[in-house]
Amino acid sequence: MGSKMASATRVVQVVKPHAPLIKFPNRRDKPKLSASEALGSAALPSHSSAISQHSKGSTSPDLLMHQGPPDTAEIIKSLPQKYRRKPMSQEEMEFIQRGGPE
């Protein structure tokens, strides 16, 4: 008899609908490139030319740091400062390139 009473007072729980916390950019409206077009558009300037352009000041540092799809660059610029990547000095880059201390 106790089990009948327990089942009569059982509470029905409602599950909340899932709301995703991560927002991804909508890329469905962008046309897909063929393999040859994708390789041609993905060609980036060499590391040495990017450094020489940076030293001349002809290209903004934001453009050099974020050479991705334009929507990604806009998202990175809108991030609060505490979530952005710390700029790397020329000395740090050289240290990494040579593989550590000499």
UniProtKB/Swiss-Prot annotation:
The modification Phosphoserine is found at residues 48, 60, 89. The modification N6-succinyllysine is found at residue 4. Residues 23-70 are annotated as: Disordered. It comes from the Eukaryota. It is found in: Mitochondrion. The modification N-acetylglycine is found at residue 2. Belongs to the alpha-ketoglutarate dehydrogenase component 4 family. This is Alpha-ketoglutarate dehydrogenase component 4. The lineage of its organism: Eukaryota, Metazoa, Chordata, Craniata, Vertebrata.
